[in-house]
Regions:
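N-terminal "first-domain core" detector
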Residues: 2-53
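Short, surface-exposed, charged amphipathic helix/loop patches that serve as local interaction elements
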Residues: 40-161
Length: 161
């Protein structure tokens, strides 16, 4: 088989899957559009939001410690990878969270994402937790080095996909 030299066209073709929306029928009369493939950039954005949401909530007087972090992580995933239009401001985001988590749709939406994408999400959250654990025990200089290395790693992953 002939090999192609890597170029921008091939890279664009490779990452185009991240822009594809898929209609998912949740019940007989309710559907949602999801982005079934989690791009590294959007996954990083979602995880960054997951961390900053806690500070924003605290600043807005919301008792964020009462929120289950696993459910908030899954809610953040839904916010980033569906077309539900969940707002970005923390007060409305928490309002959406409370309603959505209690609805029949929450588990249906989560289960509609492909297993491979959910595995990618699980690995990313595990890596984030490991990094947060490390950060609590190291100096600011070492933190900067870790961040720079992680950015480089993510950029290399994007180029490889």
């Amino acid at each position: 088989m002939a090999s192609k030299k890597l170029n921008l066209g091939l890279i664009e073709e490779s990452v185009s899957k991240y822009d594809k929306k898929e209609r998912v029928q949740l019940t007989d009369d309710v559907h949602v559009f999801i982005y079934p493939y989690f791009s590294p950039t959007r996954l990083t954005k979602m995880l960054t939001g997951f961390i900053t949401d806690q500070e924003e909530a605290k600043g807005a007087g919301i008792k964020f410690e009462d929120i289950n972090p696993v459910q908030w992580g899954l809610f953040s995933l839904i916010k980033e990878f569906t077309d539900l239009g969940i707002p970005s401001d923390i007060k409305n985001k928490v309002k959406w969270f409370v309603k959505l988590v209690d609805s029949e749709f929450f588990p249906l939406i989560i289960s509609s994402f492909p297993e491979e994408s959910m595995k990618k999400f699980g690995e990313a959250t595990k890596m984030m937790q490991e990094n947060l654990d490390k950060l609590s025990n190291i100096s600011p200089e070492e933190i900067n080095d870790l961040i720079l290395n992680k950015v480089e790693e993510i950029e290399n992953e994007q180029e490889a996909e």
